[in-house]
Curated annotation (Swiss-Prot):
Sugar-bearing residue positions: N76, N102, N281, N321, N346, N434, N451
Protein name: Protein U54
Keyword line: Glycoprotein
Top-rank taxon: Viruses
Gene: U54
Length: 458
């Protein structure tokens, strides 16, 4: 009797799916097939086209809100019609366990000297409350002198100011190394840096506003509450770019630095003047968000280098708004993800499955291919006989030239509501499979692309 839901686990799931549809040259489609996953702990679920696929698909992460029924994007990049009943869509799904890092974007940076000739504001009152390993400072500042900046996005106001806090008799050993903003009285103001020079605490304040949406101007006075703790961060950012690099629990959401209407010829760049320090322990991996019609660089973010991202449209009338999420940075130990400069557009990235074998000259990666396997119409779920759980295999990202062995991956729990004709050719064991293959006409349902708009919120 066919179970109501097929459930199994594996390190890599390869989709080799067919459907009775023709994909026209340049045509872009989204589809679902009822495939779901159980949310993994501390891992990012990735999807990338297999190098054997005739269709193009982006290397991207799967948004947790889509875990119940994963959407897939495909495009015909050839000049000919693609008959999807004969030429399957081939995708690889896998999960990478990222490091559970603590991220600080407001370290207290000690400096030796600062120009104190012109006080940048009027009266500044500060109250200090010390709770052992925490110092809380409540600040009231008036007559702030804002200095206009030239923002990358021309529709925005951008001003900066300094706020000087006299530490009075507060012991310097209570001015801890990690800052946290608990309250700011104006929604468009954020603190980008905290500096300590002798007995002077300097807050670098930024005011940003879109004058097309809100014509309010910068505030002349502010109330600010900050706390300082001795917490040691695994990842320390050189500054807080709150509207562009949004720190999550263990990752950073990267947002567009300007309103972008990319054309299909000229790439558009987003540069971030922030570097990170991890004491040489971690490397960042930027994985683009699925933005229909837009291809984004996938890149390794090396320590002490600014993040630089390029986007290019391959469909007309695309738009990205200022501060709209365009991807996420996850951090991995350097032993797993070596530093590198390799970046490629995510719609051109391809992956392949490999098996590690020993040779006199050391380990060799042999690509797993299915070139002689006929395209099936009957939906089935199967394994590969010689890829038992004790075989050392992995996934290779061809453009990035990064390999992830199963030792550096985490298995996923998959589920699928099968049709009456779906065959499951193995019994789910207690241990996860290395590779499972879901193939045939599994009931693809195409989704209108406007449901996953490039204007979508984070």
């Amino acid at each position: 009797m066919q179970p109501a839901t097929l459930q199994w686990s594996s390190y890599v799931l390869q989709l080799r799916v067919t459907t009775t549809a023709i994909l026209k040259p340049g045509e872009l489609r989204l589809f679902k097939c009822g495939l779901g996953i159980t949310p993994p702990s501390s891992a990012v679920v990735c999807i990338c086209r297999d190098e054997s696929s005739f269709t193009s698909s982006p290397f991207t992460y799967i948004d947790p809100k889509d875990y119940g029924n994963i959407p897939f994007a495909v495009q015909n990049i050839s000049d000919l019609d693609l008959d999807l009943s004969r030429l399957p869509i081939v995708l690889n799904i896998f999960a990478l366990p990222h490091a559970n890092v603590n991220i600080s974007n407001l370290p207290v940076q000690r400096i030796e000297a600062h120009d104190r000739h012109i006080i940048p504001h009027g009266q500044c009152d500060a109250k200090f409350v010390i709770y052992g390993p925490l110092t809380r400072i409540k600040i009231q500042v008036a007559d702030i002198r804002w200095i206009e900046q030239t923002p990358e996005e021309p529709t925005r106001y951008s001003f900066k100011a300094e706020i000087w806090v006299n530490l009075q008799n507060t012991p310097l050993d209570q001015i801890f190394k990690t800052g946290n903003i608990e309250f700011i009285s104006h929604k468009n103001v954020y603190i980008s840096r905290i500096l300590l020079c002798g007995n002077l605490l300097i807050l670098k304040a930024n005011y940003e506003n879109d004058y097309l949406l809100d014509d309010n101007f910068y505030p002349e006075q502010l109330a600010i509450q900050i706390s300082l703790t001795p917490q040691t961060a695994d990842i320390t950012l050189s500054q807080n770019q709150e509207t562009l690099l949004k720190c999550n629990t263990h990752s950073i959401t990267v947002c567009a630095t300007k309103n972008i209407i990319p054309n299909t010829v000229t790439p558009v760049h987003c540069s971030f003047n922030t570097i990170f320090n991890s004491n040489s322990n971690f490397t960042g991996l930027f994985i683009p968000k699925l933005l229909l019609g837009i291809s984004t660089t996938t890149g390794i973010w090396d320590e002490t280098r600014p993040l630089y991202i390029t986007m290019k449209a391959f469909k007309k009338n695309r738009r990205i708004n200022y501060s709209q999420p365009i991807g996420v940075v996850y951090f991995f130990p350097k032993q797993i993800l070596p530093p590198g400069n390799n970046v490629e557009f995510n719609w051109t990235e391809a992956s392949k499955i490999y098996v590690n074998t020993e040779s006199p000259n050391g380990p060799v990666r042999n690509t797993v291919t299915f070139t002689n396997q006929a395209v099936l119409r009957t939906p089935s779920l199967s394994t590969v006989a010689n890829l038992t759980p004790d075989i050392n295999m992995g996934i290779f990202l061809s453009s990035l030239r990064v390999a992830f062995d199963t030792a550096h991956m985490v298995p996923l729990h998959f589920s699928l509501k099968p049709g009456e004709s779906t065959r499951m050719e193995f019994m789910p064991p207690g241990t996860p499979q290395n590779l499972t293959i879901l193939e045939g006409d599994v009931g693809i349902h195409f989704i209108p692309c406007h449901n996953h708009s490039h204007r979508s919120s984070p």
